[in-house]
Amino acid sequence: MIEFHNVHKTYRVAGKEIPALHPTNLRVDDGQVFGIIGHSGAGKSTLLRLINRLETPSGGQIVVDGEDVTALDANGLRRFRQQVGMIFQHFNLLASRTVADNVAMPLTLAGDMPRKQIDQRVAELLERVGLSDHAKKYPAQLSGGQKQRVGIARALATKPKILLCDEATSALDPQTTASVLQLLAEINRELKLTIVLITHEMDVIRRVCDQVAVMDAGVIVEQGKVADVFLHPQHSTTKRFVQEDDQVDENEQRDDFAHVQGRIVRLTFQGDATYAPLLGTVARETGVDYSILAGRIDRIKDTPYGQLTLAITGGDMDAAFARFTAADVHMEVLR
């Protein structure tokens, strides 16, 4: 478990104190995929780098598996960091070393494993990330996705308990991003590894994360289960991220609906309710008519969800709305 207790970070620039992270309390449970989302300058990289003490907090306490890592000396910090792997946006591979040598680097530097065991471990890792045939290649011979897979294999070399991902998919195309996220999900599931990732893309959060924290100007403005935050955003920053992911401008959408008659509502379905024939049932029971103005069906990690924007006319609207609520469908009246 990772815990932040009133942790904050301030940089001194040109004689001025610049806060990068305001006092923050945070908890990441073992085995979770925890996402931190924010625009540039939000403080997410600072928060991530505080976990493995690449940054030293200005105050507060960071506790990992019951150990106060803010109190560790140099030897203790070296031991702790062997339990934390990290992958980066731009891969950080050594161009003059082969794929196998890059993956072996953490084990070689640790100096406590025979070469034969290192080679066996590297072979296992390359097989896990699907690069067994690329062991003798150099980074320049690899695609971006393959480079990131090497980075993931290297991060797993010391069998860490925690994997930190610093914008790990930002430099990749959408198809490659999807394959890397699938690999991270498999690693989390099979190795029971705790993963903390930062990103500026809500789609990344939606695909792989269990919990999310939304950051703005060094403050966590909203956090919770991904489904709750994604489907029912409260803070303006979160709402902007959701709109960017939906590629929908709500102001433009309101203009489009200006001529539509009736009450306009947005329904959100989760799990099995996503595929249930609820609209037809409610229409028959209450006598309402409806027009579908917009809709989508997608998944949040392994959970299906659907959103429909409807124009409802006629019949007993109050009874229809009560029926939606009774079926555990979240309803938002837009007009």
Curated annotation (Swiss-Prot):
ATP binds at residues 38-45. It is found in: Cell inner membrane. The keyword Protein transport does not apply. It comes from the Bacteria. Keywords: Amino-acid transport, ATP-binding, Cell inner membrane, Cell membrane, Membrane, Nucleotide-binding, Translocase, Transport. SMART domains: AAA (SM00382), NIL (SM00930). GO terms for cellular component: plasma membrane. Residues 2-242 form the ABC transporter domain. It is an enzyme of class 7 (translocase). Its main location: membrane. It catalyses: L-methionine(out) + ATP + H2O = L-methionine(in) + ADP + phosphate + H(+); D-methionine(out) + ATP + H2O = D-methionine(in) + ADP + phosphate + H(+). It is a peripheral membrane protein. Its EC number is 7.4.2.11. The keyword Transmembrane helix does not apply. One of its GO terms (molecular function) is ABC-type D-methionine transporter activity. The complex is composed of two ATP-binding proteins (MetN), two transmembrane proteins (MetI) and a solute-binding protein (MetQ). Belongs to the ABC transporter superfamily. Methionine importer (TC 3.A.1.24) family. Part of the ABC transporter complex MetNIQ involved in methionine import. Responsible for energy coupling to the transport system. This is Methionine import ATP-binding protein MetN 2. It comes from Pseudomonas syringae pv. tomato (strain ATCC BAA-871 / DC3000). The gene is metN2.
